Curated annotation (Swiss-Prot):
The lineage of its organism: Bacteria, Pseudomonadati, Pseudomonadota, Gammaproteobacteria, Enterobacterales. This is Capsule polysaccharide export protein KpsS. It holds the Pfam family Capsule_synth. One of its GO terms (biological process) is polysaccharide transport. The keyword Transport applies. Keywords: Polysaccharide transport, Sugar transport, Transport. The keyword Transport applies. Disulfide bonds: none annotated. CDD domains: beta_Kdo_transferase_KpsS.
Length: 389
């Protein structure tokens, strides 16, 4: 990939935009591309997609993912697009599009949540996360010159806009479901289920403000540098399904707690951080309580919600993750890191390469000179200073 992420994004002439984030972002991107002299066509797959493309012309796809390559082939004869854009490269329709584009020599660019949040979003040619084309060889980065620090506008994504757009997306998807009978969403697509989860998430957040108000001061003082931080991801994260050996987050919790009970220093603690976007969907307290008893961990396990990640990282001794982008944040804080899945930053010298059993007492620190080179390259090649909401 040549040039920076924005240059790569703009190097096409005719664009086909598939499914984007819930909301108007991909419609806005299409209009932006057209304002720069490119051609851009949106494809809608459900009522939510169509609702957010209602102010511009679009193409509708009504078939199954298996039939998508044939549809793309026929479309390409009429509209010879040279670039496909999508959000996330693990959705069934996007997987089919990626395979077809690769065979035809057509550029496939995937958007994703920012690797370096919150001021950035990710755009990569060929794939994102563990499908990224970024080199995994540490010597590649060590030989790089220092990257100039780009100007960064201090953007902050709006949680309320995200919720509002999600609400309308799910409602329109349900309202027009009979017009897209073969569409299958990559996650739950019921507005009523999601609404219940969001209401539950709100009340749990208020509850945790009370029940966990003393936890962070304890971690910052009494347990400073005495705890390992295990980061949880959302239960239906495609990065777990596609880029790890785990079938469920619960399998990860079990493995980490078992290993910690057997090999970690007896005076250490394990802090398990729940993902804030999963607050209304899943709760692991019964599982963690049962495993704590089974593995004889007693009071050495702390299960936390909604505590600020920078503070948790700053006071942690080390960090374990499946493949969350929180792993990059751990490296920013110069913390020893063990990756249990596949991640683009799981590079020798940055992360611990041995078994989890040995990690707890390993004399390992990330090479921060290497990380500086890696982060600079990552920023220039994959990040765009923007937000989705």
């Amino acid at each position: 990939m040549q040039g920076n992420a924005l240059t790569v994004l703009l190097s096409g002439k005719k664009y086909l935009l598939l499914q984007g984030p819930m909301g108007p972002f991909f419609s806005d991107v299409a209009e932006w591309l057209e304002s720069l002299g490119r051609n851009a066509v949106n494809v809608v797959f459900n009522g939510g997609d169509r609702f957010y493309c209602r102010h511009r012309q679009y193409l509708a796809y009504y078939q199954t993912p298996k039939e998508f390559p044939g549809w793309l082939r026929d479309l390409h004869r009429q509209y010879d697009f040279d670039t496909i854009l999508c959000f996330g490269d693990c959705r069934p329709l996007h997987k089919e599009a990626k395979r077809w584009a690769k065979a035809k020599g057509i550029r496939f660019l995937a958007f994703e949540e920012g690797y370096l949040r919150p001021q950035f979003i990710t755009v990569e040619e060929g794939g994102v996360n563990a499908y990224s084309s970024l080199p995994r060889d540490p010597d590649f980065y060590r030989k790089l010159p220092d990257m100039p620090t780009p100007h960064v506008e201090n953007l902050k994504p709006s949680t309320m806009k995200r919720i509002g757009h999600a609400m309308w997306y799910y409602l329109m998807g349900w309202h027009y479901r009979h017009e897209f009978p073969r569409y299958r969403h990559h996650k739950s697509f019921s507005p009523w289920y999601e609404a219940r989860c969001w209401v539950r998430a709100y009340w749990r957040k208020q509850l945790y403000k009370v029940t966990q108000r003393k936890v962070l001061p304890r971690l910052m003082n009494e347990l400073d540098q005495r705890y390992y931080l295990a980061v949880l991801q959302v239960y239906n994260d495609s990065q777990i399904r596609n880029h790890s050996s785990y079938n469920d987050v619960r399998d990860y919790i079990n493995e980490v707690m078992y290993s910690f009970s057997r090999k970690a220093p007896k005076e250490s603690y394990l802090v398990i951080k729940h993902h804030p976007m999963d607050r209304g969907h899943r709760l692991y307290r019964p599982l963690i309580k049962r495993l704590s008893k089974e593995y004889g961990l007693g009071e050495r396990i702390l299960y936390v919600h909604d505590l600020p990640m920078p503070e948790l990282l700053r006071h942690a001794k080390a960090v374990v993750t499946i493949n969350s982008t929180a792993g990059i944040s751990a490296l920013i804080h110069n913390k020893p890191l063990k990756v249990m899945g596949n991640a683009l930053y799981d590079i020798k010298g940055l992360t611990y390469q041995g078994h989890l059993h040995q990690f707890w007492q390993a004399d390992f620190k990330p090479d921060m000179k290497l990380f500086k080179k890696f982060r600079g390259y990552l920023l220039v090649k994959t990040q765009v200073n923007a937000v989705y909401y």
